[in-house]
């Protein structure tokens, strides 16, 4: 009797990816975030689909259509807040997932890592366009400020911005195209995630030691399926606590005011998950310089494989690198805090120092620490 799980063309793919997949026996809870990201993506696509059924992408009716969803549609309020806070959970999982990759040296799987970086950019673009759709004050001014950064590009900048806007300012054309892109991109993300998984399964998972685990593997099911289910339950618990008790905790009160091109909010800022990059952008007094710093900030993960100087893959046995890694985490949290503060005395200098520290840590100190640790191994 041939097992259908191993013979059926479709079941075989599922089996090789989620059931009989040989997995390292020692991967910790830091390896849960991949499956959690998959759950977040499915949740966002489903809630987004139901929101799109009632949303209208027109400047005159967008704001009131979101209000209509919250007030008149059956369970519309919970769908809307699950979608908004689901994005926050998505980014928490994303940053944890990337942080895990940096700590344990997973970036040495080049194809998997590069597809992952592309995924990160695509999710960021999708989230930015989604934030514009409710057409509140912060939606409008956020879209204006961020798209306007492209005007810093020499020669073609202004034309490029007007092309993206579909006019001479953020208006109906901009909102319509952002809605179209926001709808299609999650499906592209889902396809990219499958490619990400495909490349990962070519090499197998990394593990906390950074040493090959080919001599000692266990099947994914039941060991890691049950572990992933626990992770999923905790994720859904956290999300629902946020949705049901503090749905507006991570949002901006300005977005409950309809978009008004004639009235600029006192502090324009993006959602919390972009604040670290926004802080670096603001800390440079020159427009083009700020834009370049912003691009460099989010390009850093791509450089990681090139900057790896250590003979060991993981940071598990590298105390100096561990120390620098946690300083980097603290630095990113500092930047996130600064990005949400007004541009005035103590915050400006803190932001500039934290920005310098970010680039210094990644480009200079961490590779140096790797080399020092290599020399210490010789003793």
From Swiss-Prot:
Query: Which residues does heme b b562 bind?
Result: 83, 182
Q: Tell me what organism the protein belongs to.
A: Tragelaphus imberbis (Lesser kudu)
- Which family does the similarity line name? Belongs to the cytochrome b family.
Residues bound to heme b b566 are 97, 196
Tell me which InterPro entries the record gives: Cyt_b/b6_C, Cyt_b/b6_C_sf, Cyt_b/b6_N, Cytb/b6-like_sf, Cytochrome_b, Cytochrome_b_C_euk/bac, Cytochrome_b_N_euk/bac, Di-haem_cyt_TM
Oligomer and partners: The cytochrome bc1 complex contains 11 subunits: 3 respiratory subunits (MT-CYB, CYC1 and UQCRFS1), 2 core proteins (UQCRC1 and UQCRC2) and 6 low-molecular weight proteins (UQCRH/QCR6, UQCRB/QCR7, UQCRQ/QCR8, UQCR10/QCR9, UQCR11/QCR10 and a cleavage product of UQCRFS1). This cytochrome bc1 complex then forms a dimer.
Functional note: Component of the ubiquinol-cytochrome c reductase complex (complex III or cytochrome b-c1 complex) that is part of the mitochondrial respiratory chain. The b-c1 complex mediates electron transfer from ubiquinol to cytochrome c. Contributes to the generation of a proton gradient across the mitochondrial membrane that is then used for ATP synthesis.
Q: Could you tell me the keywords of this UniProt record?
A: Electron transport, Heme, Iron, Membrane, Metal-binding, Mitochondrion, Mitochondrion inner membrane, Respiratory chain, Transmembrane, Transmembrane helix, Transport, Ubiquinone
Any Pfam family hit: Cytochrom_B_C
Q: Where in the cell is it found?
A: Mitochondrion inner membrane
Biological process annotations from GO: mitochondrial electron transport, ubiquinol to cytochrome c
TM regions (residue ranges)? 33-53, 77-98, 113-133, 178-198, 226-246, 288-308, 320-340, 347-367
Q: Which GO terms describe its molecular function?
A: metal ion binding; ubiquinol-cytochrome-c reductase activity
Instruction: Name the PROSITE patterns on file.
Output: CYTB_CTER (PS51003), CYTB_NTER (PS51002)
Give binding positions for a ubiquinone: 201
PANTHER family per record: CYTOCHROME B
What else the UniProt entry mentions is: Heme 1 (or BL or b562) is low-potential and absorbs at about 562 nm, and heme 2 (or BH or b566) is high-potential and absorbs at about 566 nm.
Task: Kindly report the protein's main subcellular placement as a broad class.
Answer: mitochondrion
Protein name stated in the entry: Cytochrome b
Q: What is the membrane topology here?
A: Multi-pass membrane protein
Q: Which GO terms describe its cellular component?
A: mitochondrial inner membrane; respiratory chain complex III
Note describing how the cofactor binds: Binds 2 heme b groups non-covalently.
* Essential cofactor(s): heme b
């Amino acid at each position: 009797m041939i097992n259908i799980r191993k013979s059926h063309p479709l079941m075989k793919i599922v089996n090789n990816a989620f059931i009989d997949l040989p997995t390292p026996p020692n991967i910790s809870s830091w390896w849960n975030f991949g499956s959690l990201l998959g759950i977040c993506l499915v949740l966002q696509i489903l809630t987004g689909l139901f929101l799109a059924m009632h949303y209208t992408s027109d400047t005159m009716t967008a704001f009131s259509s979101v209000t209509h969803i919250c007030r008149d549609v059956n369970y519309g309020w919970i769908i809307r807040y699950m979608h908004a806070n689901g994005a926050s959970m998505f980014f928490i999982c994303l940053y944890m997932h990337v942080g895990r990759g940096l700590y344990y040296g997973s970036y040495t799987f080049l194809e998997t890592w590069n597809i992952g970086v592309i995924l990160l950019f695509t999710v960021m673009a999708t989230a930015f366009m989604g934030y514009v759709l409710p057409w509140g004050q912060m939606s409008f001014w956020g879209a204006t400020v961020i798209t306007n950064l492209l005007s810093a590009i020499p020669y073609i900048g202004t034309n490029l911005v007007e092309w993206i806007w579909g006019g001479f300012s953020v208006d109906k054309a901009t909102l319509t195209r952002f809605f179209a892109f926001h709808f299609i991109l999650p499906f592209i993300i889902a396809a990219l995630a499958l490619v990400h998984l495909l490349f990962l399964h070519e090499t197998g998972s990394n593990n906390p030691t950074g040493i090959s685990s080919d001599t000692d593997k266990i099947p994914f099911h039941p060991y890691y399926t049950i572990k992933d289910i626990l992770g999923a339950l905790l994720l859904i618990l956290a999300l629902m606590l946020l949705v049901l008790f503090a749905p507006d905790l991570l949002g901006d009160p300005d977005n409950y005011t309809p978009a008004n091109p004639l009235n600029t909010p006192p502090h324009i800022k993006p959602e919390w998950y972009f604040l670290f990059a926004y802080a670096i952008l603001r800390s440079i007094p020159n427009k083009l310089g700020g834009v370049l710093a912003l691009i460099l900030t989010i390009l850093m993960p791509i450089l990681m494989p090139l900057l790896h100087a250590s003979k060991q893959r993981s940071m598990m046995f590298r105390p100096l690198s561990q120390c620098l890694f946690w300083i980097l985490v603290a630095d990113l949290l500092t930047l996130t805090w600064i990005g949400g503060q007004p541009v005035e005395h103590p915050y400006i200098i803190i932001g500039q120092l934290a920005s310098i520290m970010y680039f210094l840590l990644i480009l200079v100190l961490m590779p140096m620490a790797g080399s020092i640790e290599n020399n210490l191994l010789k003793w």
